[in-house]
């Protein structure tokens, strides 16, 4: 978890829930004052965000858990997300930069070393779910952009050609990357 995301959110007057699987990163950012709130409860994370938005109070919330769980929860609970990005280390998805859903950070680390083929299979399955959740949210009005972390390329490599224009990663992807306003 970067400290830049939650700090930028609060500076801009917004509300954000930022997922992170590594508790030590959350603890560091919270101790440094870069993120305001910490929870491992999705209902609590979104309730805090809604309360802050309703009162026009900036808030940054670190959710200790997997981003796919967070996004699938938002889909299931019909929670609108205005702006969505992803900062997982997808440039190194199979080297530990991406945590498969259903695994703790520690389980991810162990599986990466003990069973890399199974780790890769789980990463691919999770990337597919990640894409489907984003696609559903975008269909409901969420604006998603790639943070320049190779997320869309990783999804394509995981076996999802529909993330690419014309089904080929040579023609670009369906979501924008590195957005400026």
Predicted regions and their residues:
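Catalytic or ion-translocation cores adjacent to nucleophile or general acid/base/metal-coordination motifs
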Residues: 2-54, 85-132, 166, 170-181
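Conserved divalent-metal-coordinating catalytic cores
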Residues: 49-51, 58-63
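Glycine-rich beta-alpha junction loops
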Residues: 23, 65-68, 87-92, 148-154
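Polyanion-binding loop/helix "lid" in catalytic or ligand-binding cores
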Residues: 61-63, 125-129, 136
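Structured helix-beta-strand junction loops
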Residues: 55, 80, 140-141
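A structural signal for short, well-ordered beta-strand segments and their strand-loop junctions
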Residues: 18, 62, 83-86, 143-149
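Glycine-rich, aromatic-lined ligand/substrate-binding cores of catalytic
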Residues: 130-181
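Active-site/ligand-binding-proximal alpha/beta "capping" segment
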Residues: 60-88, 95
């Amino acid at each position: 978890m970067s400290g830049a995301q939650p700090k930028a959110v609060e500076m801009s007057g917004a509300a954000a829930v930022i997922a992170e699987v590594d508790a030590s990163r959350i603890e560091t950012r919270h101790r440094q004052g870069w993120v305001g709130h910490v929870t491992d409860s999705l209902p609590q994370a979104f309730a805090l965000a809604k309360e802050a938005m309703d009162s026009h109070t900036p808030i940054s919330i670190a959710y200790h858990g997997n981003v796919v769980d967070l996004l699938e929860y938002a889909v299931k609970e019909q929670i609108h997300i205005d702006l969505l990005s992803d900062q997982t280390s997808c440039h190194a998805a199979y080297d530990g930069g991406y945590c498969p859903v259903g695994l703790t950070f520690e389980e991810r680390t162990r599986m990466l070393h003990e069973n890399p083929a199974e780790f890769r299979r789980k990463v691919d399955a999770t990337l597919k779910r990640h894409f489907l959740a984003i696609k559903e949210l975008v269909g409901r009005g969420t604006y998603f952009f790639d943070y320049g972390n190779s997320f869309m390329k990783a999804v394509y490599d995981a076996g999802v050609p529909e993330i690419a224009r014309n089904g080929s990663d040579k023609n670009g992807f369906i979501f924008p990357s590195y957005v400026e306003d």
